[in-house]
Swiss-Prot record:
GO cellular component annotations of the record: cytosolic large ribosomal subunit
Biological classification of the source: Bacteria, Bacillati, Bacillota, Bacilli, Bacillales
Gene Ontology MF terms: rRNA binding; structural constituent of ribosome
Protein known as: Large ribosomal subunit protein uL22
Pfam family, one: Ribosomal_L22
Organism encoding this protein: Staphylococcus carnosus (strain TM300)
Length: 117
């Protein structure tokens, strides 16, 4: 059985979020939370909050035991880009792309759900 949580349009570049997600993918949920608390990255609190949301979804929606859960999937896709301009020398301007992320975390207890035919 799986439970999922999604955070959309987070103002951190996906490339930076993936560094944190790579640390927790495949880990036990308790271990993943401990790793996130000690990780000194800007996306760490956002990912931790999202993981807690996935835990709450698993417990509330599917009556899963939160002690057995494992981070099955964790990925960050690119969200909409905010385009800004920075003034440069001699009247020019350069484009600055403020990137956003859509972050998804899926937790699983390792048991397969019964498929209906």
């Amino acid at each position: 059985m799986e439970a999922k949580a999604v955070a959309r349009t987070i103002r951190i570049a996906p490339r930076k979020v993936r560094l944190v997600l790579d640390l927790i993918r495949g880990k036990n949920v308790g271990e993943a939370i401990a790793i996130l608390k000690l990780t000194n990255k800007a996306s760490s609190p956002v990912v931790e909050k999202l993981l807690m949301s996935a835990l709450a979804n698993a417990e509330h929606n599917y009556d899963m035991n939160t002690d057995e859960l494992v981070v099955k999937e964790a990925y960050a896709n690119e969200g909409p880009t905010l385009k800004r301009f920075r003034p440069r020398a001699q009247g020019r301007a350069s484009a600055i792309n403020k990137r956003t992320s859509h972050i998804t975390i899926v937790v699983s207890d390792g048991k397969e759900e019964a498929k209906e035919a």
